[in-house]
From Swiss-Prot:
Name of the gene encoding the protein in the UniProt record: ccmE
Record region (Disordered): 140-160
Function: Heme chaperone required for the biogenesis of c-type cytochromes. Transiently binds heme delivered by CcmC and transfers the heme to apo-cytochromes in a process facilitated by CcmF and CcmH.
List of residues binding heme: H122, Y126
UniProt KW keywords: Cell inner membrane, Cell membrane, Cytochrome c-type biogenesis, Heme, Iron, Membrane, Metal-binding, Signal-anchor, Transmembrane, Transmembrane helix
Membrane topology summary: Single-pass type II membrane protein
Side Periplasmic, residues: 29-160
Coiled-coil regions listed in the entry: none
GO cellular component, one term: plasma membrane
Cross-referenced InterPro entries: CcmE, CcmE-like_sf, NA-bd_OB-fold
Location of this chain's protein in the cell: Cell inner membrane
Name of a matching Pfam family: CcmE
Membrane-spanning residues: 8-28
Name assigned to this protein: Cytochrome c-type biogenesis protein CcmE
C-alpha cells in the first residue's frame, strides 16, 4: 500500500467511524427529543398519535374537572384552538384556570394529550418563552398584561 492509499484509507475509516457514532447518538437521543406546540399549531400540523410533545397555552376557564383519585381533565387553549389534557398526579400549587401552563406527554388523539408532567407559571409576571412566543404568534399576547416572557439564561439578582 502506498502512502497516499494509506492516508485515504485512514481518512475514510475515520469518517465512517464518525458517521456511525453520530448515528448511534441520534438514535439514543430520539426518545428524549420533545417538540413544543401551541394548540393552533397542533391543529394545523398534528403529529401522529403516540408522539411525545409539549403543549403550552392557558388553562381554559371552566374546563377543570377532577375525578376520584388524582386524575384531572382540563383544556389548554390559545383562544383559537383547544387541546384536552388528562393528567394523573399532583398539580402544581399555582395551577389555576386562566393561567399559563406547559404540559408534556403523549398525544392520544388529534387534540387530546395524556400528560406526564404539568408546569404552571410561577408568579404573576412569568410565562415560559415558548408559551409567550406561541401566544404572540397567534395574536393574543397582551403587552400591557401581566404575562411577560422569561429571559432565557438570565441570572437572578444577587441580594446582599
Amino acid at each position: 500500500m502506498t502512502r497516499k492509499q494509506r492516508r485515504l484509507f485512514m481518512i475514510f475509516g475515520a469518517l465512517g467511524t464518525l458517521g456511525v457514532a453520530v448515528g448511534l447518538i441520534l438514535f439514543a437521543l430520539s426518545d428524549n427529543i420533545v417538540f413544543f406546540y401551541g394548540p393552533t399549531e397542533l391543529a394545523e400540523k398534528a403529529p401522529h398519535p403516540g408522539a411525545r410533545l409539549r403543549i403550552g397555552g392557558l388553562v381554559k376557564p371552566g374546563s377543570l374537572e377532577r375525578e376520584a383519585g388524582q386524575t384531572v381533565h382540563f383544556i389548554v387553549t390559545d383562544n383559537k384552538h383547544d387541546v384536552a389534557v388528562t393528567y394523573t398526579g399532583l398539580l402544581p400549587d399555582l395551577f389555576r384556570e386562566g393561567q399559563g401552563v406547559v404540559t408534556e406527554g403523549t398525544l392520544t388523539g388529534k387534540e387530546t394529550l395524556r400528560a406526564d408532567s404539568v408546569l404552571a407559571k410561577h408568579d404573576e409576571r412569568y410565562m415560559p418563552r415558548e408559551v409567550a412566543d406561541a401566544l404572540k404568534k397567534q395574536g393574543v399576547w397582551q403587552e400591557d398584561g401581566q404575562a411577560k416572557p422569561a429571559t432565557q439564561g438570565a441570572a437572578a439578582p444577587l441580594i446582599r
